[in-house]
Amino acid sequence: MRISKPSLRSTSIQCYLCFLLNSHLITEAGIHVFVWGCISAGLPKTEASWHDVIYDLKRIENLIQSIHIDATLYTESDVHPNCKITAMKCFLLELRVILHESRNEDIHETITNLIILANSSLNSNGNVTESGCKECEELEEKSIAEFLQSFVHIVQMFINTS
């Protein structure tokens, strides 16, 4: 399963271990460098999460082309910047419809990973309350292709403001 911290995808703990073993820092200071390096490798890096969400959305788009899912999803096509968190929560809820409609394991894995990444990035925004925003059920129902395009657009809004 591909669900993992996106920050650990490119971080290699072996580099820290090699540095420690091949250097003359086999002292208390060297051990501190190694321990702090390992700790920093495991810290969440939310600035990369939205890029990973877009990657997963593109992957879902490609996977859905190979199967037929005839569903319409509540889609926010014109997101007001003051309602982007509310809209994102609606998009994440609607992704579960695709999970329910699809029996494809790759789609299930990718959507589950995307939901985890997006929720962890949303949690970094704190408990922001938005008022005057549409409820999910008030949104227009659109095809999966249009839904995914709108989803990418709102994720880009999060990237541009971070």
Curated annotation (Swiss-Prot):
Cleavable signal peptide: 1-29
Keyword Transmembrane helix listed: no
Locations listed in the record: Secreted
SS bond list: 83-133, 90-136
Prodomain residues: 30-48
UniProt xrefs under Gene3D superfamilies: Interleukin-15/Interleukin-21
UniProt-listed Pfam families: IL15
Domain of life, source organism: Eukaryota
GO molecular function: cytokine activity; cytokine receptor binding
UniProt GO BP: cell maturation; extrathymic T cell selection; immune response; interleukin-15-mediated signaling pathway; lymph node development; macrophage differentiation; natural killer cell differentiation; natural killer cell proliferation
Keyword Cell membrane: no
InterPro entries assigned to the protein according to its UniProt record, in alphabetical order: 4_helix_cytokine-like_core, IL-15, IL-15/IL-21_fam, IL-15_mml
Glycosylation sites: 119, 127
Protein keywords: Cytokine, Disulfide bond, Glycoprotein, Secreted, Signal
Positions in coiled-coil regions: none
One cellular component (GO) term of this entry: extracellular space
Protein family: Belongs to the IL-15/IL-21 family.
Annotated function: Cytokine that plays a major role in the development of inflammatory and protective immune responses to microbial invaders and parasites by modulating immune cells of both the innate and adaptive immune systems. Stimulates the proliferation of natural killer cells, T-cells and B-cells and promotes the secretion of several cytokines. In monocytes, induces the production of IL8 and monocyte chemotactic protein 1/CCL2, two chemokines that attract neutrophils and monocytes respectively to sites of infection.
Entry protein name: Interleukin-15
Organism whose genome encodes this protein: Cavia porcellus
Species classification: Eukaryota, Metazoa, Chordata, Craniata, Vertebrata
Gene this chain is encoded by: IL15
